[in-house]
Amino acid sequence: MSKKLKVGIIGLGSMGSTHLDIYSKIDGVEVIAIADSIQSRLDGSSKAEGNISGQAEGGVSGLSVKKYLNGMDLINNSDIDIVDICVGTDLHYIFVEAALARNKHVLVEKPLARTYDEAKKIIKLAEKSSSNIMSAMCLRYWPAWVFLKEAIEKSIYGKCLSLNFRRQTSFPGGAFYSDDSQCGGALLDLHVHDTDFINFCLGLPDAVFSQGYNGPSGGIDHVVTNYIFNKTNASPLVSSEGSWTMQEGYGFNMSYTANFENGTLSYLLDEEETLKLCRYGYEPENIKLKEGMGYEFEIRAFVDEILSGNKTNLDLLSQAAKTIAIVEAEKISIETCSVVAIQT
């Protein structure tokens, strides 16, 4: 039997805990170390909750792994092959830099970095490294979004005329999310998912026009954006809305509506993961999707990439970096109430 890849996870918030659960389901890897600056997360006496059912269901209680209060100590463990970085966004760059310097493969949670300047530095590090690195933009692997991308690219229902994405919830609370300088507000921490998928699916927009307002993070916590593609009759109308200013008890809304020449797709996250197709002359149809969440599929893809000997897909990584440039343009658009061109 071939040697298993050894994984170390830095950060045991909702995403780190979710990743921990997922690795236990994947052949060829095993988690041998975890790190968090909060002792109670390491010993299992506390854990973070996620937005979506199925996130962070397991835990560290009874887990036989090395535990570190400092993520840099985990990176210096010579037995570790993969470093999974799930710390605060403002810390992504320093941990990615350190892990690549130690020749570790790196999976880094979204967004790739706190700023586009930091993201560009990560791209340069990746270009020089023999290690693999992936930005964990989970919508690229989420079954309903995979289905949508294929429907657009293959014109399954004819030309795509319009796309609208929504991602809304109540304020998550806590010190990290209360500090825009760390998290980037809902604009960067939450809304980035939809901006990235638009970039991934349709390519870099030419410009954006955004409106929004500040919230409990001290930064932009509710945003509505129109993405402008200067391709006459070639690109759909594209918009998205992201917010964590909803009142307590609202829940989590993750949805999209895609209108095509010959059909309308409507997705709303729920227990059944239902994607509805509406067409003239037909009864609405529920489309059965592949079971599972994007988190699992992205991690499986990363592990497979390493085990197969493939190198980092720099195009996909660069796309994740440019997503941050789009988000920063959205921020400027809100502040100036103007259309802002994307500069990369």
Positions of the model-derived regions?
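C-terminal helix-rich "cap/oligomerization" subdomain common to oxidoreductases
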Residues: 1, 29, 82-84, 304-344
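Predominantly a Rossmann-like dinucleotide-binding segment in NAD(P)-dependent oxidoreductases
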Residues: 139-217, 337
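Rossmann-fold dehydrogenase core element
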Residues: 121-138, 159-163
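N-terminal Rossmann-like dinucleotide-binding module
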Residues: 1-61
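Active-site loop of classical SDR/Rossmann-like NAD(P)-dependent oxidoreductases
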Residues: 288-300, 315
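Beta-loop-alpha module in the N-terminal Rossmann-like domain of NAD(P)-dependent dehydrogenases
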Residues: 19, 62-125
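Hydrophobic residues in well-ordered beta-strands that form the structural core
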Residues: 108, 133-135, 240, 267
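Contiguous beta-strand/loop segments that form the cofactor/metal-binding neighborhood of enzyme cores
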Residues: 195-274, 299-311
